[in-house]
Amino acid sequence: MSSALSLTPSAVSAPTRLRLPDLLHTTDRFADDVLRGRFTRLLPPGGFPADSRWFARLHSDDELDVWLINWKPGLSTELHDHGGSLGALTVISGELREQRWDGHRMRSRRLAAGDQAAFPLGWVHDVAGDALSVHAYSPPLTAMSYYAVTADQRLRRTRTELTDASAGG
């Protein structure tokens, strides 16, 4: 059995009643709440760390997790999926660079302040940048797999990690 995968984003139904447009609306609403100061109490007292990604959970229930993430230049998430969860993000400030696997090769896009992105099941990407963003996952993340692209342009899963409820996605 080969460990190389040929994953493509698909319209596979998710184990949640929420859909991608719902998650985009959620990240937009929470981004507005962050800008209005609703979550100031969650921000680090001395400002965001200079050398690491920072995150805080803004909301959690049985079908939805919402995170605020501060990204630092030079740090990336590595190429990963979101297990059995759908995802979405809204960039509040700065810019994120997303490298995603389209089933055949890597594609790149930049997301600036105000931009949104949605992640269906099977979405494999790497995110980096210097930004503040809100992310929503439904159902809440329980596992993430990490990948490498092989010389023959296939995905190879390198590891799968269970997510820690306290460690943002």
Which residues does each PLM region occupy?
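Short acidic-glycine-tyrosine-enriched beta hairpin
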Residues: 88, 100-129, 159
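Conserved strand-loop elements at the edges of beta-sheets that form or border functional pockets
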Residues: 60, 81-83, 90, 129
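A short glycine-rich, His/Asp/Glu-containing loop-to-beta-strand
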Residues: 44-73
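Short beta-strand His + acidic residue motifs that chelate non-heme Fe in jelly-roll/DSBH
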Residues: 78-80, 98-99, 124-130, 135
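Double-stranded beta-helix
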Residues: 130-169
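N-terminal leader/capping segments at the start of a protein or of a new domain
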Residues: 1-43
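Glycine- and acidic-residue-biased ligand/ion/polar-headgroup-sensing regions
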Residues: 73, 84-99
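Conserved short histidine dyad/triad with adjacent acidic residue
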Residues: 67-82, 111, 120-122
